[in-house]
Each structure stands twice: as structure tokens, then as C-alpha cells.
Amino acid sequence: MAQAMASGLLEGSLQLMSGSNRSSSSSRTRGPAGVFIVRAQQQEQQQGMSSSAADPQSNRRAMLGLVATGLASASFVQAVLAEAKPIKVGGPPPPSGGLGGTLNSDEARDLKLPLKERFYIQPLSPTEAAQRQRESAKEIVAVKKFIDQKLGHMFINDLRLRASYLRYDLNTVISSKPKEQKQSLKESSAGKLFQDIDNLDYAAKLKSAPQAEKYYADAVSTLNDVLSKIG
């Protein structure tokens, strides 16, 4: 009986010893793995700290690059502006037609006058005005071809332009005539002439070929009468 109890105690102690040995061996084998994990975590933390320390440096470098680019562009713009050549601007044109398009720049304008009497044409001498009025008369007579083709609306602008020149030049020529001729020419011949031209203008605006032919014949007849009286 005593021997059996002694053998049982011996086996239990041996089992305890074997279990402790196993636990110690397992703890010994697990030790290096834990150390490796701790070291890996330390390395990751060090890398994160180094990357966070490098971020301000990269931002600082980017800012310095932007500043350098801005300074270079500013210096380039200054160089371009410094090389710009000034534009030479001449003085004002001389009075009464010193340059093209200024022939009537110094004429007085009376805005209270009717539009037909408000002229923007350079004054000419009576001789030059008589020559230009003959040219205007030829242009007015030449609108017959448009009337024959029933294209009366195509000459309205030219008819108005030539009528304006003719009115202005007739006034210049009539003003140079003796006093007893001025009034009769203005009232009888010249007045009727421009009324006939206005009627022709209106007929062309309406695109009425019969009326255009009628008023054209009246205008040409009156025009020839006026030119024959003025000479």
C-alpha cells in the first residue's frame, strides 16, 4: 500500500516537472517572436516620424519654387515692358482739310436748320460747284436703267446723295448770280426740281415702276431747265 502511494506521488511529481519544462521551453521559443514584433513596431514608428519630419521640408521646397517662379515671371514682364517701343502721335491737323476726312471739320453746324438745308460738304467756288453739279446731274439721269429693270429701290441711296450735292452746289452757284436772278431761280426752277426728285425717291421706295417713270421724266425735264437757266 505504501509502495503504491509512493509510486503515485513520484509519477505526479514527474508529470509536474515535465509540464513545467514544457512551459519553460514554450516560453523560450516564444520569446524571440515577441521581440521581433516590438522591433518592427519601433521601426514603423521611426519611419512615420521621419516621413512626418520630411513633409514640412517638401512643403518648404515647393513654396520656395513658387516664389522663384513668380520672381522670374515678374522680371520677364518688366523686360518686355522696357523693350516696348512708344507710338509716335502727330499733332492736330491744320484747319479746314489738313488730312483726309477732315475737309469739313471746321464748318459751323446750325442744328436748328431742317435736314435738307444742313449740309456737311466742303464749300467750293462757284466754278467748281458748277462742275460738280453737272456730274451730279449725270448720275441722276443715269438711274433710268434701274427703273427700266424695275430695280428702282436699288438707286435710292445714290439718288439721295447726288440730290444733296446738287442742292448744295446749286445754292452756291445761284448765290453768285445777280440779285434779280437769285429769287426766281430759287423759287421757280430749283424748288420744283427737288420736289420732283423727292417724288421719284418716294416712288422708288414704294417699288412702283409706273410712278417712278412718271416722276423720273418730271425730274429730268426740270433738271435740264434749271441747268440751262444757270448756264
From Swiss-Prot:
InterPro entries: PsbQ-like_dom_sf (IPR023222), PSII_PsbQ (IPR008797), PSII_PsbQ_pln (IPR054099)
PANTHER family referenced in this protein's UniProt entry, alphabetically: OXYGEN-EVOLVING ENHANCER PROTEIN 3-1, CHLOROPLASTIC (PTHR33399:SF3)
Region Disordered: start-end pairs: 15-57
Family: Belongs to the PsbQ family.
Gene name linked to the record: PSBQ
Gene3D superfamilies: Oxygen-evolving enhancer protein 3 (PsbQ), four-helix up-down bundle (1.20.120.290)
Protein name as it appears in the record: Oxygen-evolving enhancer protein 3, chloroplastic
Keywords associated with the record: Chloroplast, Membrane, Photosynthesis, Photosystem II, Plastid, Thylakoid, Transit peptide
Listed Polar residues bias regions: 48-57
Highest taxon of source: Eukaryota
Transit peptide start-stop: 1-82
Example GO biological process: photosynthetic electron transport chain
GO cellular component: chloroplast thylakoid membrane; extrinsic component of membrane; photosystem II oxygen evolving complex
Subcellular location: Plastid, Chloroplast thylakoid membrane
Biased composition range(s): Low complexity: 18-30
A Gene Ontology molecular function term of the record: electron transporter, transferring electrons within the cyclic electron transport pathway of photosynthesis activity
